[in-house]
UniProtKB/Swiss-Prot annotation:
It comes from the Bacteria. The gene is rpoB. Belongs to the RNA polymerase beta chain family. One of its GO terms (molecular function) is DNA binding. Keywords: DNA-directed RNA polymerase, Nucleotidyltransferase, Transcription, Transferase. DNA-dependent RNA polymerase catalyzes the transcription of DNA into RNA using the four ribonucleoside triphosphates as substrates. Residues 1187-1234 are annotated as: Disordered. This is DNA-directed RNA polymerase subunit beta.
């Protein structure tokens, strides 16, 4: 059953039983396709919407005729990253200004700002940082019906009309059968008022329009208005309470609210949803007709009275222009009114309109008008093109309003259905292109205001397009979107998989979406319509669960923004599965019966079983083969890329699979990547689509290979050069390094992998290491998921990773003169300067530790007023060395490493720098981090733990042939967690290693227990996969046999080096004078309320006293205590803590006179700590490592720099809760989306 498959240059033995009928699509197509649409269509739409901009008088008009994007960005992607600039290209727009009085036309090209470009990896470079725009899942515009029950159990129907932008219409019923409407969330009016306002004046007209409905009659009784004018005034009063209503102003307001495309927009998708829901065909199908229905054009009888209307007939009835049909429901006649739309390609017309390629339904009134007025084909086709906006209106129409009300009345009789808002047919994806288009539209709307104002101010004859247009609002809108939108995120670049899944992420949060607090359980839950569209597994744990999800492997987004998934069509007549692939959205899929991908087929693709297990909406049903409509394409179609990389996913509990797919994104790239022995076959596709590897652009022969360049000579003699990235820093500080995997003289094909990137091995994703594990406890070192590892993994650098930190030093202009980058630093010995060059910048290759100088820099100090004598001496003996202080860039606490790169930017060399900065130096320091105690490791099945001990190789348990284990895991971690996949992986890994195989075991279609048992027996292992182990310390055999094998283990980004932290003295908070908290602020460990109780319980009075005074906020006491420790004296009595003084001040602010009195009645003066307190010993003790302990950051900043700081460091005052490092930190899979 096992067969070899090729993945890149490696052959894997695949256990898959199902043939792949469809290639997995390009995984970052979502991003690329959407941005491409924005450049080609999106921009055009926005410019067309806003053109022409007319002056208030109407004699000037400004039109945006055309636009182009120059295809030469100023810097390449790599240069932009180095220079902290944005990768963008100038947008040029052709503008036409028409003077309608004189007929004069001025045309010119206007620069409209730089538009950020998408890199070929689907990301943007904004200010040097790589960012991703996450797609957003929002409610689709359209009309939604909902039912609720009042306290008497009576069914009430509610409807909401949601446009893309514009006023909402909400229809509601009360218990007395009166239907009301709310316009734009204002007070409600009876529905008949709205009907009168759109032209149905009298009660008879209304009843005639919608049928003699009880609810309509009850509503008419409630309605006080009697004509269109009264109705308009009634609506005006609701919308503009307090303003005097006139019929004219009421009519113009009402029309502007709903029928002005600038104010009201359904968007393409809204129109599509409206027509789908309200058109006749879906509503009358499968009901009996109450009357004979005749085609008004041909006179043909379509349906006889009492005959059941089939789907095909219903479509025919609608497409011949019939808009009202009466049907029989339980013996009652119910009138169904559509929204007057037809499919133009099926409407009986004398001309062929297929060349126009109109997919949407069109308004039949406008169509008839065109056909009546024009007689020859060319004129009709032209008129149809010109009147597209009327045929397919973007705003709501009167027909739509009538159809909405008709649908609501029909629902009372059980005709139609209510909507489920969590169904993916009612939620759509807004990708980059659309989000960007909306931002651009906002910018242009602001620009329009400016242009109109300028048109009135400037002289009509002198005016030019350039001086009318101010591009500032457009540029600002785009900058704001990329810089600070919730959906523009700093790319997760830990490894190639995290990049890939970040680009495929779908978020329900963000502007126009949900908020974490408001989102209930239903929105977050897995829905049956997610099948094949949104992964049920990959979502963060914590407050964002279910709100942030991932697209599945085969999913794609259609033009309306709905997620589609592919199916194979089944020929119902013969029960044969064809190779025809159909992509379907969630609401289309609801109509069909769909078989699973693993349903057995014979060699002719016929179903083998008599009954086929299928899905129909949320039901699982069993049907004969002739009733099946479609079949899944692949078993992995229901999961995302991350989840499809977990072998034996089907044997893991869903909660653990979730952790497994999230933790793969946190694996750090290792020094020696190694592809998994037991994979799923998805590793190659994931690595290639992530953009981490380099692919050959053409066929050819490798001419030259060096560490950072590959040259390939193509068939036609051209040379392709490929430049590799060497030891670059990723967004997360991991190392990006590419290595060639071809040799000189090799023949390569187009699309072949020629260079590996981080975490890839021969073109396959390689996030971890294959290690020999045994499931056995060892001396309690596996307690609570802890992991015992062998020293071998440390010595061989098996789990070693490289991390690169970036440090910046800027030389600015200050009030007292410019800062200077120099080697001449006051009070620093030559020893500290040994690695600096003559400019004062560290040399590449230097090894640095915490506190070492990276860039020498001095800042001028304020000079005191000189006396006359000093000035005289100064004049005679020349300038004394100017007073400067040392502000060098030093390696922060706890950091060390080797300098791998230094970049210097300065004004003189013409580099762009922020205002006030003359020179900038950027130093990159790399660290090699071996695996160490406290690091977090995990498998792919959610089995995570922290390393508790590193044991010498000779002490590890060993196999009968003397091979020592590399890792011991706790067997108790398996049963309760129900992730049995790890055990199967271990067994299969053992066999594969013995046979020298690499294995592909795809999800839901991989190796079975039987397959593994057979292989174990064949390879000479015990069929239960257990081995006798011996104690490495004594050589004695253990009592029981142990499960041993190869498992793929990942080293995660939660490294102990980043979490370790210690402090003796450091910065203090401003108000409370207590130490700050957290590693980033170099803070202390919080000794909280509960810890105080513990010391109180033990009666440890002295410890408790110093905890609360000299170790915290007794300002004088801590200085004296430090001095005493340095001098070796006894520590003096503590004073009054600052927090007590703060408390006293707060009480005094409540007008309570608080005094502190000693036992013998002496009053103690309470004075808040100030800089110039006399009783503070000399500050030369250099207690505060971080500079002046009491100065607010603003002051320090202003002394050094001329301008005000833009943002203050946030360590001025901290909430007391974030002081202690939470032990949970190690186990929280922190998802950056949170």
């Amino acid at each position: 059953m096992v067969r070899p498959v090729q993945a890149g240059s490696r052959t894997r033995m695949s256990f898959a039983k199902i043939d792949e009928v469809l290639e997995i699509p390009d995984l970052i197509e979502v991003q690329k396709k959407s941005y491409q649409w924005f450049l080609e269509e999106g921009l055009k739409e926005v410019f067309q919407e806003i053109s022409p901009i007319e002056s208030f008088t109407g004699n000037l008009a400004l039109e945006f005729v055309d636009y182009r994007l120059e295809n030469n960005p100023k810097y390449s992607v790599e240069e932009c990253k180095d220079r902290d600039t944005t990768y963008a290209a100038p947008l040029k727009v052709k503008v036409r200004l028409t003077n309608r009085e004189t007929g004069e036309i001025k045309e010119s090209e206007v620069f409209m700002g730089d538009l950020p470009l998408m890199t070929d990896k689907g990301t943007f470079i904004i200010n040097g940082a790589e960012r991703v725009i996450v797609s957003q899942l929002v409610r689709s515009p359209g009309v939604y019906y909902d039912q609720q029950f009042d306290k008497f159990g009576k069914k009430l129907i509610f409807a909401t009309v949601i446009p893309n932008r514009g006023a909402w219409l909400e229809y509601e019923e009360d218990s007395n059968d009166v239907i009301y409407v709310r316009i734009d969330r204002t007070r409600k009016v009876p529905i008949t008022v709205l009907l009168r306002a759109i032209g149905y004046n009298t009660d008879i007209q209304i009843l005639d329009l919608l049928g003699e409905e009880e609810k309509l009659k009850a509503t008419l009784d409630k309605d006080t208005t009697k004509s269109e004018e009264e109705a308009l005034i009634e609506i005006y009063k609701r919308l503009r309470p307090g303003e005097p209503p006139t019929v004219e102003s009421a009519r113009s307001l009402f029309n502007a609210l709903f029928f002005d495309p600038k104010r009201y927009d359904l968007a393409k998708v809204g129109r599509y949803k409206f027509n789908k829901k309200l058109a006749l065909k879906a509503r009358i199908a499968n009901h009996k007709s109450a009357k004979r229905i005749v085609n008004p054009i041909t006179g043909e009888v379509l349906v006889e009275e009492g005959e059941k209307i089939t789907r095909e007939k219903a479509e025919e009835i609608q497409n011949c222009g019939i808009n009202e049909v009466e049907i029989l429901v339980d013996g009652k006649v119910v009138k169904v009114v559509g929204n007057n739309t037809v499919d133009i390609n099926k409407y009986p017309m004398p001309y062929d309109v297929s060349s126009l390629n109109i997919k949407e339904l069109v308004n039949v009134r406008v169509l008839r008008e065109i056909l009546d007025n024009f007689s020859d084909e060319e004129a009709v086709l032209n008129e149809i093109k010109n009147r597209m906006d009327e045929l397919v209106p973007k705003h709501i129409t009167k027909d739509d309003i009538v159809a909405t009300i008709s649908y609501q009345l029909n629902l009372t009789h059980g005709v139609g259905f209510v909507d489920d808002i969590d169904h993916l047919g009612n939620r759509r994806v807004r990708s980059v292109g659309e989000l960007l288009q909306n931002q651009f539209r906002i910018g242009l709307a602001r620009l329009e205001r400016v242009v109109k104002e300028r048109m009135t101010i400037q002289d009509v004859n002198e005016v030019t397009p350039q001086n009318l247009i101010n591009i500032r609002p457009v540029v600002a809108a785009i900058r704001e979107f990329f810089g600070s939108s919730q959906l523009s995120q700093f790319m997760d670049q830990t490894n190639p998989l995290s990049e890939l899944t970040h680009k495929r992420r779908v978020s329900a949060l963000g502007p126009g979406g949900l908020s974490r607090e408001r989102a209930g359980f239903e929105v977050r839950d897995v829905h049956y319509s997610h099948y094949g569209r949104i992964c049920p597994i990959e979502t963060p744990e914590g407050p964002n669960i279910g709100l942030i999800t991932s697209l599945t492997t085969y999913a794609r987004v259609n033009e309306y923004g709905f997620i589609e998934t592919p199916y194979r069509k089944v020929d119902k007549a013969t029960g044969t599965v064809t190779d025809e692939i159909v992509y379907m959205t969630a609401d289309e899929e609801d109509e069909y019966i769909i078989a699973q991908a693993n349903e057995p087929l014979d060699e002719n693709n016929r179903f083998i079983n008599d009954r086929v297990v299928c899905r129909l909406r949320e039901e699982i049903i069993s049907v004969p083969p002739t009733e099946v409509d479609f079949m899944d394409v692949s078993p992995k179609q229901i999961v995302s890329v991350s989840a499809s990389l977990i072998p034996f996913l089907e044997n893991d509990d869903a909660n653990r699979a979730l952790m497994g797919s999230n933790m793969q994104r946190q694996a750090v790239p290792l020094l020696k990547p190694e592809a998994p022995i037991v994979g799923t076959g998805m590793e190659y596709k994931a690595a290639v689509d992530s953009g981490a590897v380099i692919l050959a652009k053409n066929d050819g022969i490798v001419e030259k290979v060096t560490a950072d360049k590959v040259v390939i000579r193509t068939k036609d003699g051209k040379r392709d050069e490929y430049h590799l990235l060497k030891f670059k820093r990723s967004n997360q500080g991991t190392c990006i390094n590419q290595r060639p995997i071809v040799n000189e003289g090799d023949e390569v094909k187009k699309g072949q992998v020629i260079c590996d990137g981080p975490s890839t091995d021969h073109g396959e994703l390689a996030l971890g290491k294959n290690v020999l594990v045994g499931f056995m406890p060892w001396e309690g070192y596996n307690y609570e998921d802890a992991i015992l590892i062998s020293e071998e993994l440390v010595m061989d650098d098996s789990l070693t990773s490289i991390h690169i930190e970036e440090y910046d030093a800027e030389a600015r202009d200050t009030k007292l003169g410019p800062e200077e980058i120099t080697r001449e630093i006051p009070n620093v010995g030559e020893d500290a300067l040994k690695d600096l060059d003559e400019r004062g910048i560290i040399r590449i290759g230097a090894e640095v530790r915490a506190g070492d100088i990276l860039v020498g820099k001095v800042t001028p100090k304020g000079e005191t007023e000189l006396t006359a004598e000093e000035r005289l001496l100064r004049a005679i003996f020349g300038e004394k060395a100017r007073e400067v202080r040392d502000t060098s860039l030093r390696v922060p606490h706890g950091e060390s490493g080797i300098v791998v790169d230094v970049k210097v930017y300065s004004r003189e060399n013409g580099d762009e720098l922020p205002p006030g900065v003359n020179q900038m130096v950027r130093v990159f320091v790399a660290q090699k981090r071996k695996i160490s105690v406290g690091d977090k490791m995990a498998g792919r099945h959610g089995n995570k733990g922290v390393i508790s001990r590193i044991l010498p190789v000779e002490d590890m348990p060993f196999l009968p042939d003397g091979t020592p284990l590399q890792i011991c895991l706790n067997p108790l971690g398996v049963p309760s967690r129900m992730n049995i996949g790890q055990v199967l992986e271990t067994h299969l890994g053992l066999v594969a290693k013995a046979l020298g195989w690499y294995i592909a075991s795809p999800v839901f279609d991989g190796a079975t227990e039987k397959d593994i048992e057979e292989l174990l027996a064949k390879s000479g292992f015990s069929p239960d996969g257990k081995v006798q182990l011996y104690d490495g310390r004594t050589g004695e055999p253990f009592d029981n046999k142990v499960t041993v094998g190869y498992m793929y283990m990942l080293k995660l980004h939660h490294l102990v080096d980043d979490k370790m932290h210690a402090r003796s003295t450091g910065p203090y908070s401003l108000v409370t004078q207590q130490p700050l908290g957290g590693k980033a602020q170099f803070g202390g460990q919080r000794f909280g309320e509960m810890e105080v109780w513990a010391l109180e319980a033990y009666g440890a009075a002295h410890t408790l006293q110093e905890m609360l005074t000299v170790k915290s906020d007794d300002v004088t006491g801590r200085v004296k205590a430090y001095e005493a420790i340095v001098k070796g004296e006894n520590i003096p009595e503590p004073g009054i803590p600052e927090s007590f003084k703060v408390l006293v001040k707060e009480l005094q602010s409540l007008a309570l006179d608080v005094k502190v009195i000693t036992e013998d009645g002496q009053e103690i003066p309470i004075k808040e700590f100030e800089d110039d307190d006399d009783d503070v010993p000399d500050a030369t003790l250099n207690i505060n490592i971080e500079g002046r302990e009491d100065a607010p950051p603003e002051e320090v900043y202003e002394e050094e720099y001329e301008e005000e700081p833009e943002e203050l460091p946030e360590d001025i005052d901290f909430e007391p809760d974030n002081f202690d490092i939470d032990s949970e930190d190690l186990f929280m899979d922190d998802d950056y989306d949170g």
